[in-house]
Amino acid sequence: GGPSAGLMFSLAVIDKLTTGDLNGSKFVAGTGTIDPEGKVGPIGGITHKMVAAQEAGATVFLVPADNCDEARSMRDYGMELVKVDNLGQAVDALHILTSGGRPPSC
């Protein structure tokens, strides 16, 4: 994965360095670039990535805030679309999901 895998790579590192399972029992996929301040940036081809994630069994997809309009066209694919602006918000959203809450959505 190139820069569009930045969000998920960052979350994987956080998951390994912290206690517990960041995503609980949920199959979480997502995409987005990460800048040095932790801002999640938009990517191209999000609908293709969403289709691949859904076909792989994902039930949650982390969406860069700037890609939400395009991602909404895929709502019928059965995944919860979680809107993220930065890495901290992505971590918070996963904690909300694992506790049964509803994080910000697209």
Model-derived regions: residue spans:
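Peripheral, non-AAA+ core regions of ATP-driven protein-machinery
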Residues: 1-106
